[in-house]
Amino acid sequence: MVTILQYSADVTATTISTYRSELSAQLAQNLGKWSFELKMYKPNPASIGRSEHHNGNIPQGQQEAAAADQEIGGVAALYTLTQAHSKGDMVYVTQGSAVQGQPGVVVSDSFDMVLQNKMKSIWILRQTLRGDGAEYELMGDAYGRVKVRLANVFLQGTFRGLLFQYEYEGDTLDDRQQQHLMEFIQSSGFPSSNLIIGGNGSGLVQTGTQFVEALAQK
């Protein structure tokens, strides 16, 4: 599969209803509700303080300031992504100076519990973004078969924006398909700026890196 992501902050929480009505007008098949969850983990300040200073009396504020710019094993942040349509699978994405080539892997969604329970002395959950929306499918000679997902994005219950995801079957997206997608986006009045096409990895890993690029630090 190939995915394209788009995030817009210049909307309200009710904008999604307008776009869903437009999808219905385009005769898209409603596949039901869709949701996702993106979590960001950062190095535990206490762990960095112990490993670098061998001193348990470092003030908490200094530890947190150090953690903001520090890495553990060359990794500065871990992200986990779960999506409603890929139940049981979680994408694990890393960022940092040591991350080269494949930036992540697909793991069981139980890995999130391992991070929070077994590895909390090393990694701390810093941010959770949740998306709630719907999934549609477009079919036609112009588009091929493409799924359109859209969701309101929330950070700790506060609305932050609207995310679109376009998913194509196959391993590549040719120029013709990309052109038809842009025509569909423009004719539907959907946001067309800041489209994230491609990315590191492939399949779900590529999707995970797109989510991180679009939503990290939002």
Swiss-Prot record:
It is found in: Nucleus. Transmembrane segments: none annotated. GO terms for biological process: regulation of transcription by RNA polymerase II. GO terms for molecular function: transcription coactivator activity. Pfam families: Med20. Component of the Mediator complex. This is Mediator of RNA polymerase II transcription subunit 20. It comes from Yarrowia lipolytica (strain CLIB 122 / E 150).
